[in-house]
């Protein structure tokens, strides 16, 4: 199946701005996110398609290539065929005026023909994303909480404000490349003589030189910092949920925007409750007599103890629902339920009075006590031997 146009995937027109692309991605990612569409294979595929489109369109380099060549820019074949160059003589032709077409020749001859790569080296670049694994308790996941975390990340140097130059000075235009970040080199190849561009070896492609570096960042413009960040955990999160903190990742190069910080949540299990989605399960041990006669019991919930009337004749394995006593739905809209699973306990040891009472119960029920005693050494005698 042919791939859909990446702009179409995000609901955009070709030439959309970076901000439009980012807004469209957030909207579509939220629409098709697996957490919102559990078990929906179509939504899962759409979510993957949206991420693939955004991965290309958010990157200036990839976006430029896609705008020019479409999917062929990334399918490995490049979409270009048609024989070799047999006998072609460039005759000193300068490919630097051919824009993106020069990028194709760059892979063959090592330099840049279009100059695009070096110019992009000067441009602000988005910083890398970070991930932090956060452990929280069962109760914190149910009700939400605030957690302070400590991370180490790259930030702009506060002394030089990201310029890399000592306070009171500023970077100078590179005298070798005149600020372009690239120099032209004539190369002799089997195809003839070519004029190509390559990264300036004096400024490293930035177009600037720092004569008096900042003493704090040593001319880099960035420093590593330890930061404490307060993370607000919404009620209802579960293990594997990810909380994005926009702009809290690594600082981008050349004063570019910072990346994002992703908090991956891990919830510790409860000692008494089990969780399935937004519902909570609790095993309540009840005596055989109370299950038969009915009783009012006290049941623990995440909100505190509640009273519940167990009806007479409750059977082992019966589940009772406590409506609204489960986990809040993480996207809002109420809470799940708590289910109380009745575990009827049969006594392992009986005293004489209990034994007689049960025998009396059997007789009242029309059952023969003699039949029980004669089988398997007697029902009650086995309990006595265990004492």
Swiss-Prot record:
Organism: Clostridium perfringens (strain 13 / Type A)
Cofactor comment: Binds 2 Zn(2+) ions per monomer.
Residues that, per the record, bind Zn(2+) 2: 174, 177, 200, 203
Residue span, J domain: 5-70
Record text about domains: The J domain is necessary and sufficient to stimulate DnaK ATPase activity. Zinc center 1 plays an important role in the autonomous, DnaK-independent chaperone activity of DnaJ. Zinc center 2 is essential for interaction with DnaK and for DnaJ activity.
GO molecular function, one term: ATP binding
Identification of the protein by name: Chaperone protein DnaJ
Cofactors demanded by this protein: Zn(2+)
Gene expressing this chain: dnaJ
Residue numbers binding Zn(2+) 1: 157, 160, 214, 217
Function field: Participates actively in the response to hyperosmotic and heat shock by preventing the aggregation of stress-denatured proteins and by disaggregating proteins, also in an autonomous, DnaK-independent fashion. Unfolded proteins bind initially to DnaJ; upon interaction with the DnaJ-bound protein, DnaK hydrolyzes its bound ATP, resulting in the formation of a stable complex. GrpE releases ADP from DnaK; ATP binding to DnaK triggers the release of the substrate protein, thus completing the reaction cycle.
ZnF (CR-type) residues: 144-226
UniProtKB keywords: Chaperone, Cytoplasm, DNA replication, Metal-binding, Repeat, Stress response, Zinc, Zinc-finger
Subcellular location: Cytoplasm
């Amino acid at each position: 199946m042919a791939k859909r146009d990446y702009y179409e995937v995000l609901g955009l027109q070709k030439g959309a701005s970076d901000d439009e692309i980012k807004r469209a991605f957030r909207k579509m990612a939220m629409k098709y996110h697996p957490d919102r569409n559990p078990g929906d294979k179509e939504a899962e595929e759409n979510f993957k398609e949206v991420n693939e489109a955004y991965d290309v369109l958010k990157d200036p380099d990839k976006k430029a290539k896609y705008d020019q060549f479409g999917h062929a820019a990334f399918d490995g074949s490049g979409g270009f065929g048609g024989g070799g160059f047999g006998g072609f003589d460039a005759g000193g032709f300068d490919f630097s005026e051919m824009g993106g077409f020069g990028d194709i020749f760059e892979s063959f001859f090592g330099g840049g023909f279009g100059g695009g790569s070096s110019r992009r080296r000067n441009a602000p670049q988005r910083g890398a994303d970070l991930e932090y694994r956060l452990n929280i308790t069962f109760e914190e996941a149910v009700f939400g909480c605030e957690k302070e975390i400590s991370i180490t990340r790259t930030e702009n140097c506060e002394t030089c404000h990201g310029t890399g130059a000592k306070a009171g000075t500023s970077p100078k235009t590179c005298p070798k490349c005149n600020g372009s970040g690239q120099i032209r080199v004539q190369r002799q190849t089997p195809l003839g003589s070519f004029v190509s561009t390559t990264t300036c070896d004096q400024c490293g492609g930035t177009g600037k030189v720092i004569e008096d570096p900042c003493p704090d960042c040593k001319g880099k413009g960035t420093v590593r910092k330890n930061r404490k960040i307060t993370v607000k955990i919404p009620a209802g999160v579960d293990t594997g949920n990810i909380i994005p903190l926009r702009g809290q990742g690594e600082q981008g190069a050349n004063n570019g925007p910072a990346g994002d910080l992703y908090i991956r949540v891990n919830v510790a299990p409860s000692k008494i409750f089990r969780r399935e989605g937004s519902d909570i399960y609790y095993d309540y041990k009840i005596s055989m007599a109370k299950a038969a006669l009915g009783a009012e019991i006290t049941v623990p919930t995440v909100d505190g103890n509640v009273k519940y009337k167990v009806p007479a004749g409750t059977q082992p394995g019966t589940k009772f629902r406590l409506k609204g006593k489960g986990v809040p739905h993480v996207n809002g809209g109420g809470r799940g339920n708590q289910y109380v699973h009745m575990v009827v306990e049969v006594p392992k040891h009986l005293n004489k009075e209990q034994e007689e009472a049960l025998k009396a119960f059997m007789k009242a029920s029309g059952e023969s006590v003699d039949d029980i005693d004669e089988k398997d050494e007697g029902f009650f005698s086995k309990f006595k031997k265990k004492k």
